[in-house]
Design a protein with these regions (language model features):
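Helix-to-loop junction immediately C-terminal to a conserved catalytic motif
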Residues: 388
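The feature captures the beta-strand-to-loop junction immediately N-terminal to the Walker
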Residues: 370-375
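A short, surface-exposed alpha-helical micro-motif characterized by mixed small hydrophobic
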Residues: 544-546
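Catalytic Walker B motif of ABC-type/P-loop ATPase nucleotide-binding domains
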Residues: 503-507
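Conserved ABC transporter NBD signature motif
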Residues: 396-403, 416
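Transmembrane alpha-helices and adjacent helix-loop boundaries
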Residues: 2-329
Length: 582
């Protein structure tokens, strides 16, 4: 069973979608499209479509939505009004139903996308209650409590309803397969990778140029479109709809389908829909205990599989690593410092009136490695945070070549070529190594020499972490299982794979062994030799002595001394402030 699932997982998404449609059609053929079993199979498909949509919003984007039932109801009513009242063709009624969900999802996502998990849950729950009430109140359109009947499938405007019993079942089977394919494509796309990155580590994602807000709005819109399409299919399946079919419980049911199946996984929503439609129907034969057994079953399943039945969320990122594995070894040029790349001009940054940076100025040149050192709390990390846009400066400016970075968002600064690592690696647990590198891949056409050097550096960093870039299985595994050292190398490899102009490294040696530090130093030196300006914040003074061209010593938010590392130990003020020697 496990081997079969493994093989099915490895099929391309398009084939998986086709297979799903074929299986649904075969089962429908065996049971008869008008039979009770046929109805149940179609209901599973319809709910699966809505659950796949919710998996985009909640699973991929991590936005807890309790409002999937509202989009489902909206799609059902838009489709039912167009099909029943205006006698539109079924394909167009379904399409417009889905579009209504897309628009409603985007309209919800724009204000809701900036809220935290609880705020989002509250807004979406409010939406379900509002929509449910509107279905009753706007009876001129919705039929109020009586609902809408006569929802017949037509091929063209005002034509007679189609005779065939197969139109609706076939449409349901095809749309389910199509939605599964679209859902998988979404996860595999750059947008999907960005969405998961924001879910797992929003600050790390912003450092790669990803806008968290837009990924959430897109996920809301896509998730609602799926739900509305499911709702439209439900209207045709039932031929009659009323508000009773869309109680707030429906949204909870969709959520449980996603969580039970495995939030964020690609097969989970299908499994969730299958189980949560079939199990209650089987239990209906035992009316006194059915709810108790159903509840206990859910508890036991979640206890045994806390991340759901299908927990794997990482997806292959085709060709992401080919350029790394196939890259020929490149000779490393001698390192020379060139023109200024990054300049801090009198940067101040205060927190509640206390200045963490109080007028810091320094310059980093092309190909140069600058060590930013100083005692704990002297402002080193704050300086990196100001450069990469996480903290806007209180006053002063940071200039990247000719661009003033002050006031730009972290995403905008990252897109201009500033990459960084963090004291604690901000990698994305639900994404594979391949996906990390694919997400960070440069958007434009970088200088070929820089590109070759960066690819070589990425390969060597992965190897330093004991990861073989040619080992496809390892490269497609979720990074959540990786050790601290491996994550450090992965984070650095990710930052470098974007071919940055400036590389900021925050305590890269922390937690690494002596040999790992040495290997890391060689990679950083080679990247600098290819023209990248590097700033290293580090307490490991031996590493600083070996690696950097120039040291900038911070103390209490000001530059205490600047010069070559060899002279560091001879400067009294540095010894006093930094090493505690008075
Ligand atoms: N978000 C924040 N809110 C309030 N104070 C902050 C914030 N970030 C930094 N600080 C303060 O700014 C000062 C400088 O902190 P910073 O982390 O930049 O020092 P550091 O030199 O990197 O220290 P370490 O070597 O321990 O990492 C500290 O006093 C710190 O408490």
């Amino acid at each position: 069973m496990r081997a079969t699932i493994q093989k099915l997982r490895q099929l391309p998404a398009s084939l998986q979608g086709l297979l799903l449609t074929a299986v649904a059609l075969l089962v429908l053929l065996a049971s008869g499209p008008q039979s009770y079993n046929g109805y149940v199979i179609q209901l599973i498909c319809v709910y699966a479509v809505a659950a796949l949509g919710l998996n985009i919003t909640t699973g991929f984007a991590g936005a807890l939505s309790l409002g999937q039932g509202a989009a489902f109801a909206l799609g059902a009513y838009v489709t039912a009004v167009l099909a029943g009242t205006y006698e539109w063709p079924f394909w167009l009624a379904l399409l417009l139903g889905a579009v209504s969900g897309l628009v409603a999802g985007a309209a919800t996502g724009f204000p809701a996308g900036r809220l935290g998990v609880i705020g989002l849950a509250m807004i979406s729950l409010g939406l379900v209650l509002v929509v449910n009430d509107m279905l009753i109140q706007f009876r001129g359109v919705t039929g109020g409590m009586f609902g809408i009947s006569g929802i017949d499938a037509r091929l063209w405007f005002k034509s007679d309803p189609v005779d065939s019993l197969w139109v609706v079942p076939a449409a349901i089977a095809v749309v389910t397969g199509l939605c599964f394919w679209l859902h998988s494509r979404y996860r595999l796309s750059r947008l999907g990778q960005a969405t998961v990155a924001v879910r797992d580590e929003p600050i790390g994602a912003s450092a790669l140029g990803v806008s968290g807000y837009l990924t959430k709005v897109a996920a809301f819109a896509a998730g609602s479109a799926f739900a509305a399409l499911g709702g439209g299919l439900f209207a045709y399946l039932s031929a009659y709809i009323s508000p009773d079919a869309f109680s707030p419980n429906l949204s909870i049911l969709f959520l449980v389908m996603v969580v039970l199946g495995g939030s964020g996984s690609r097969l989970g929503p299908l499994a969730g829909a299958l189980i949560l439609v079939l199990v209650p129907l089987q239990l209906d034969e035992y009316p006194h205990v059915n709810t108790i057994v159903y509840g206990l079953l859910l508890i036991v399943l979640m206890r045994l599989r806390p991340r759901g039945l299908f927990s794997r969320s990482a997806a292959p990122a085709p060709k992401a690593l080919q350029h790394v594995t196939d890259a020929p070894a490149v000779p490393v040029p001698a390192r020379e410092s060139g023109e200024p790349v990054l300049t801090a001009h009198d940067v101040k940054r205060s927190f509640g009136g206390v200045y963490a940076l109080n007028g810091v100025s320094f310059t980093v040149h092309r190909g140069e490695i600058v060590g930013l050192i100083g005692p704990n709390g002297s402002g080193k990390t704050t300086m990196l945070n100001v450069v990469c846009g996480l903290y806007p400066p209180t006053s002063g400016r940071v200039v990247l070549q000719d661009t003033d970075l002050s006031g730009l968002s972290p995403e905008a600064i990252a897109r201009r070529g500033v990459a960084r690592t963090f004291q604690t690696p901000k990698t994305f647990p639900g994404m594979s190594i391949e996906e990390h590198l694919a997400l960070a891949a440069p958007a434009g056409e970088p200088d070929p020499e820089l590109l070759a050097a960066c690819r070589q550096a990425v390969r060597r960093l992965l190897e330093l972490g004991g990861l073989d870039p040619a080992d496809r299985a390892a490269m497609t595994r979720e990074s959540r299982a990786m050790s601290h050292g491996q994550l450090r190398f992965l984070e650095a490899a990710t930052a470098i794979s974007g071919c940055p102009r400036v590389l900021l490294l925050d305590e890269p040696a922390a937690g690494l062994s002596a040999s790992e530090i040495e290997g890391f130093e060689r990679v950083v030196a080679d990247v600098a030799a290819a023209g990248v300006a590097v700033v290293v914040v580090e307490h490991h003074l031996d590493m600083i002595g070996r690696l950097v061209d120039r040291v900038v010593v911070l103390d209490l938010g000001t530059v205490l001394w600047e010069g070559p590392p060899a002279e560091l130990h001879d400067v009294d003020s540095v010894r006093a402030a930094y090493m505690g020697v008075r």
